[in-house]
Amino acid sequence: MFEFLRFYTFYLALLSGIIGLISMHKLPTNRAKFLVIIIWFAVVIEKVGYYFTEWTGLLNYYVFNFYMLITFSAYILLLRSLLSKVNHRLIAILCLMLFIISFFLNILYFKEDVNHSFTYSFAIGVILIMILACLYLVEIFNSDKILNFKRSVFFWYILGILVFHVPFLPFMMALNWFLIKHDESIFSLVVFILNVLAHSCYITGFLWSEKKYNY
């Protein structure tokens, strides 16, 4: 019934990407512009993933595992750049190393056929991003940035990452462990709703943020 919704996530990413481009004048640094690049990368991956099976006859796990490796690494590096305390930045580097190691361990686990969903790498990545996001929020709330944090595109971007991945993680793990029945209609509905929430945060950040808080 809702299977078609999953394919509309492409248009959500496209909308966010377009608004990001329109808002480039408010993104003064390479770090801020990097947010738009990540979104456009998602647009490309959504389209490639859609046609991958048609082109190759294979399931598109290859595409989305590659997407996970790049985007999660990018999220961790973004959070590292936003952290001001040296020990927190060191934790971010350790998180990046741990995630990359987990990803390649997943490849070794599926060495006979790596065209599977790397569920455990996804879970580890989400947990690491949650830890770093908490450190980022703690630093904000313990500094003068608390006065204008809603005007920062970075706050809204990190919030968007969290509102998608934190609820999706237990849902994905429940499917993987067969705690709930895999229903393509429900899966597509959940993915679509979480994408709406995430891209709403991204768009809010682009439109509501102010240039002076986006350095």
Describe the role of every protein-language-model region:
Residues 1-215:
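Terminal, non-globular segments
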